[in-house]
Amino acid sequence: MQRELTIPSNDAFREIATKTEEEEMLAGLMAAQKHLPCKFFYDEAGSKLFEQITRLEEYYPSRTEKSILKRHAGELMRGAEGASLVEIGSGDCSKISILLQALPEVILKTSIYVPVDVSLSAIEESRCKLEERFGAIEVCGIVADFIQQIHLVSQYENKIFCFFGSTIGNLDRRDAVRFVEKLGKLMNTGERLLLGLDMVKDKAVLEGAYNDEKGVTARFNKNILNVANKILGTNFESEYFRHHAFFDEEKQRIEMHLMATRDITIKFPFFEGGLEIPKGQTIHTENSHKFTSHHIDEFASASGLSVRAVYTDSNRWFTLVDYIK
């Protein structure tokens, strides 16, 4: 069944559907290497679990990127009068709040914040928090798959795209280049892209960030099976899957999988039989590619943007690149 579009009466949000969620999930589960699109992590429960992940000691990307933003917020927001701050894959509002705090109220009144995310609940929560803290700024959220539907923001002027959290690393290398190329075509002269990149580093540090001792990342990973059950009407039982995350050094990426701990038959309500998942087989749920200086230049070349500034931390673990058209 096609998901209905939801347009709340306050007109602060827009939700746009592409192909059905069922089609996307089924295609992944029927593939030779079973997989589920990582955007399905972020139902209400998944969004809350990810917020917990960002506060974990092992998960350095969030706190490192925030420290960079805090240190350079004034520079980043210089000349932001009348800006449309478009946050791609916005999640919670903790990072954009750092930038908004650097703006005086008179400039906030001329600005628009446009969070783009697949999670309506995350956007609603962010909107409430931002209105309470920064009442002067207008918030206009778009609930959409930003990979397919980023063109929806083309109407906004004086755009500053904020693509934080190294979320671009969830895309395959070619798709990441294509996406920044698409952004470049949406941008007018003088508009900017703030891109957060998690850099290649020691394998132990990388794997530790995705295998926390408290098991929050494991719960987050397994929650995608609950989402599949809601969408497909299947009978996935998360206790029969083990969280498995590792760094592939050749591909320079973390891979997250769910590994079956026993032979499993998954039932579907709309056709007979079932999907056999033997013990040891995995469902690939996410890639998180890591980056080098080469990729910073590659993105600039593909998008037609120039590197305005590059910010990093003392360990050079995380980089924030300020691109301009």
Descriptions of predicted regions:
Residues 170-182:
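A short, conserved alpha-helix within the catalytic core of class I
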Residues 82-91:
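Conserved class I S-adenosyl-L-methionine
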Residues 116-121:
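Conserved SAM/SAH-binding beta-strand->alpha-helix loop
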Residues 185-200:
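Conserved beta-strand signature within the Rossmann-like core of class I S-adenosyl-L-methionine
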Residues 1-40, 47:
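N-terminal auxiliary segments of SAM/dcSAM-dependent transferases
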Residues 33-80:
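Class I SAM-dependent methyltransferase Rossmann-like catalytic core
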Residues 207-289, 297-303:
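Substrate-binding/catalytic lobe of Class I Rossmann-like enzymes that use SAM or dcSAM, i.e.
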Residues 92-108:
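Conserved SAM-binding loop of SAM-dependent methyltransferases across substrates and taxa
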